[in-house]
Amino acid sequence: MIDTIAIIGAGLAGSTAARALRAQGYEGRIHLLGDESHQAYDRTTLSKTVLAGEQPEPPAILDSAWYASAHVDVQLGRRVSCLDLANRQIQFESGAPLAYDRLLLATGARARRMAIRGGDLAGIHTLRDLADSQALRQALQPGQSLVIVGGGLIGCEVATTARKLSVHVTILEAGDELLVRVLGHRTGAWCRAELERMGVRVERNAQAARFEGQGQVRAVICADGRRVPADVVLVSIGAEPADELARAAGIACARGVLVDATGATSCPEVFAAGDVAAWPLRQGGQRSLETYLNSQMEAEIAASAMLSQPVPAPQVPTSWTEIAGHRIQMIGDAEGPGEIVVRGDAQSGQPIVLLRLLDGCVEAATAINATREFSVATRLVGTRVSVSAEQLQDVGSNLRDLLKAKPN
């Protein structure tokens, strides 16, 4: 009998799981525990509309009235000290312990910081929560120089927003291209060109070695000696799963809490979802996917599994972004093996879809200003029908017709 489900982490994954549990008819107690003071909100806006000042606060994931109507016990500002797995109890820094029958870890991740000289200077920011976005927005003034260390999604989104605020922007990317991990080299190069067209300066193969300044950051010094002046710095080099509770309790972890395709951890009554969890991928391997859409899917899967309901097949990374005025959607790993097939022509203003084809199956897709085509491409990835490069390239054909082909 499952009388009580506790969820540690009241963000996107935690709140989505609570909603999914109620939607599936669970009538027992749900405790949603968060150490932040805010109810779950849409973090994808922090680098865009909130940072731009177009929204004072991000939209809520769920209406605040829902929690009360669904009889979900929300405890914000509550910090967990440890897990007592043997007795199925959560210990807090203060107050009585909380017993559970099933536990979901949805503690998310924190911004990775740089352990280099000058890292404690004023004016150096990270972007992970609302307070971070508000602090960065206050720091950015027209005419100032912002240096972004890291050319991933958040860095490129902030660069786009900062240029709209008339801020001078330089991106320092340690690798040879922007956005390779999520978009691949080809799309990364295209995004770099679009950012440069906006006035963003991009320095590749630029490894930040130290920050320079007296109390306030004034420059970033690269490993090769390049000096980049800065009034404000954003360190955007990824995130670290907040898996300390799980590790301390003896739950298996490796760059996140290790889970199976149902979200179950090495402890039978404990599940994990969202950025803290390393999930198995369809193409093999296991990692934290760190996307809004995957966090939602993982939370729904874990909720089903806690109630012994069927769960879907292993996941495929799915995300979206807005960079330099373009909407980019992606599914799968763009840099995997196979052939990259391009559908559309950027020079003529057509929507563009890049599809990674392997052994006659679409394994990944990236769509640029092509929302309708991406919807079909997502189904091609999911159904694994047999297609050819010529069929995918033919813009005169309807991608939807390819769904009728036989699975490979």
Curated annotation (Swiss-Prot):
Q: Which cofactor does it need?
A: FAD
Q: What class of enzyme is it?
A: oxidoreductase
Task: Choose one Gene Ontology CC annotation of this protein and give it.
Answer: cytoplasm
What are the BP-aspect GO terms? Answer: catabolic process
* Annotated catalysed reactions: 2 reduced [2Fe-2S]-[ferredoxin] + NAD(+) + H(+) = 2 oxidized [2Fe-2S]-[ferredoxin] + NADH
Binding-site residues for NAD(+), renumbered to this chain? 145-173
The pathway this protein participates in, as annotated, is:
Xenobiotic degradation; biphenyl degradation
Q: List the disulfide bonds.
A: none
**Annotated signal sequence range:** none
Domain of life, per UniProt, equals Bacteria
MF terms (GO), sorted A to Z: ferredoxin-NAD+ reductase activity; oxidoreductase activity, acting on NAD(P)H
InterPro entries of this UniProt entry? FAD-oxidoreductase/Apoptosis (IPR050446), FAD/NAD-bd_sf (IPR036188), FAD/NAD-binding_dom (IPR023753), FAD/NAD-linked_Rdtase_dimer_sf (IPR016156), Reductase_C (IPR028202)
User: Sorted alphabetically, which keywords does the UniProt record give?
Assistant: Aromatic hydrocarbons catabolism, FAD, Flavoprotein, NAD, Oxidoreductase
The EC number(s) this enzyme carries: 1.18.1.3
- UniProt-annotated binding residues for FAD: 4-35
**What quaternary structure, including any partners, is listed in this protein's UniProt entry?**
This dioxygenase system consists of four proteins: the two subunits of the hydroxylase component (BphA and BphE), a ferredoxin (BphF) and a ferredoxin reductase (BphG).
Protein family per UniProt: Belongs to the bacterial ring-hydroxylating dioxygenase ferredoxin reductase family.
Name by which UniProt lists this protein: Biphenyl dioxygenase system ferredoxin--NAD(+) reductase component
Organism encoding this protein: Paraburkholderia xenovorans (strain LB400)
Origin organism lineage:
Bacteria, Pseudomonadati, Pseudomonadota, Betaproteobacteria, Burkholderiales
